[in-house]
Amino acid sequence: MPQLNPNPWFTILIFTWAVFLTILPNKVTSHKMPNELLTKDPSNLLTEIWYWPWH
């Protein structure tokens, strides 16, 4: 049974993980958010109680 021969599949596995661990992290981390997140001052946030009209 050729499926049980680990020789070609093991090398494919090693090369695939080598690509995943060397090339892809650089491509993923090079992306930047288009909009910077703004931090709001927590003292300006006013929360009001909102009563639901249950009829």
UniProtKB/Swiss-Prot annotation:
Belongs to the ATPase protein 8 family. GO terms for biological process: proton motive force-driven ATP synthesis. GO terms for molecular function: proton transmembrane transporter activity. Disulfide bonds: none annotated. F-type ATPases have 2 components, CF(1) - the catalytic core - and CF(0) - the membrane proton channel. It holds the Pfam family ATP-synt_8. The keyword Mitochondrion applies. Keywords: ATP synthesis, CF(0), Hydrogen ion transport, Ion transport, Membrane, Mitochondrion, Transmembrane, Transmembrane helix, Transport. One of its GO terms (cellular component) is mitochondrial membrane. It is a single-pass membrane protein. The chain crosses the membrane at residues 4-24. This is ATP synthase protein 8. Mitochondrial membrane ATP synthase (F(1)F(0) ATP synthase or Complex V) produces ATP from ADP in the presence of a proton gradient across the membrane which is generated by electron transport complexes of the respiratory chain. F-type ATPases consist of two structural domains, F(1) - containing the extramembraneous catalytic core and F(0) - containing the membrane proton channel, linked together by a central stalk and a peripheral stalk. During catalysis, ATP synthesis in the catalytic domain of F(1) is coupled via a rotary mechanism of the central stalk subunits to proton translocation. Its main location: mitochondrion. The keyword Transport applies. It is found in: Mitochondrion membrane. The lineage of its organism: Eukaryota, Metazoa, Chordata, Craniata, Vertebrata. It comes from Polypterus ornatipinnis.
